[in-house]
Regions:
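Core dinuclear metal-dependent hydrolase active-site scaffold
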Residues: 28-42, 46-98, 102, 153-218, ...
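Binuclear metal-ion centers of metallo-dependent hydrolases, dominated by the metallo-beta-lactamase
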Residues: 142-165, 169, 238, 242-285
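Active-site environment of divalent metal-dependent phosphoester hydrolases
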Residues: 94-95, 109-113, 135-138, 161-164, ...
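Bacterial N-terminal signal peptides that target proteins for export
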Residues: 2-12
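Active-site metal-binding motif and surrounding structural segment of the metallo-beta-lactamase
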Residues: 91-137, 218-223
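A short acidic, amphipathic alpha-helical/loop segment
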Residues: 115-121, 140-142, 213-217, 236-240
Length: 285
């Protein structure tokens, strides 16, 4: 019996010594000093870092926002080139390019709804987006691509609508009308567009004043009219753009029919410093 007590006391003493050694070494009792715990900690650390690494990869794969793929031959006649070719309000497009994957029409005025230009840029499988109020007019034009009628490719929209046009391209329609003049009445149902292409958001305002409901527009690149008379002025346009805060602002609708080249200067000077103005209208004077 005394032998059992002595052995128990000895065992307890050995266990206490082992615990003290373990505390001193910072290593749990019973773990061998063979580097295995350290390897496990390193592995756990690497696993914890993986989500951060994945986030960096996502950022690298995100579409780069720039304006190199944009041309504007005149007025508000915009062409965006990428995996898909997009035209907005094509006007005075004299070359029979027949390369448009998507054509967007903001309203019915001749410098935005130009039949010869539409027929020059359309191809057999083009999709045309227009205000719902213009659907009959667009259909009546009987726009053809190289070989056939493309009426089946017409999508009509009202402000507030969103349409997925194809993989990688979504279009949102936003209001476009005048507040203090009657050139573009709200009742006409004309619109501007936000075109989302592989994550990059292009805002084409159409002919509009600086409407309160446009202050919530989210975009990377904004095309806004600056010529005044029929639309907002350069100063008003800058005020709107400073609220929606795109990376780039491109003035349109000036320098030919209405407005002067100097309107772009006024617009650019009034922009916040973190917004870059880019001139694209080729014939502005």
């Amino acid at each position: 019996m005394g032998m059992i007590r002595k052995t128990a006391k000895t065992g307890i003493l050995v266990l206490l010594i082992a615990l003290l050694v373990s505390c001193a070494s910072g290593r749990p009792a019973g773990k061998r000093d063979n580097g295995e715990p350290e390897k496990q900690e390193e592995q756990q650390s690497e696993e914890m870092q993986e989500p951060v690494q994945d986030q960096e990869e996502v950022e690298e794969e995100a579409a780069e926002v720039n304006t190199d793929n944009i041309t504007i031959n005149t007025q508000s006649s915009i062409r965006i080139e990428g995996d898909k070719i997009i035209y907005i309000d094509p006007y005075k497009r004299t070359e029979a390019a027949h390369d448009a994957d998507l054509i967007l029409i903001t309203h019915a005025h001749y410098d935005h709804f130009d039949e010869p230009s539409l027929k020059n840029v359309a191809k057999d499988d083009s999709v045309i987006v227009c205000p719902e109020s213009m659907l009959a007019d667009v259909t009546r034009l009987n726009i053809k691509g190289q070989n056939k009628n493309i009426d089946a490719g017409i999508v009509s929209m009202n402000a507030g609508d969103t349409e997925e046009i194809c993989e990688g391209i979504t279009v949102e329609a936003v209001p476009a009308y005048n507040l203090n003049k009657n050139f573009h009445p709200k009742a006409n149902g004309w619109v501007g567009y936000i075109i989302i292409v592989d994550g990059v958001r292009y805002y084409a305002a159409g002919d509009t004043d600086a409407l309160p409901e446009l202050e919530d527009v989210a975009c990377d690149i904004a095309f806004v009219p600056v010529g005044g008379t029929y639309t907002m002025t350069a100063t008003e346009a800058a005020g709107l753009v400073n609220k929606i805060k795109p990376a780039y602002a491109i003035p349109i609708h000036y320098g030919t029919i209405v407005g002067r080249a100097a309107d772009a200067d006024t617009f650019g000077a009034a922009l916040d410093k973190d917004i870059t103005m880019v001139r694209k209208v080729e014939d502005a004077k």
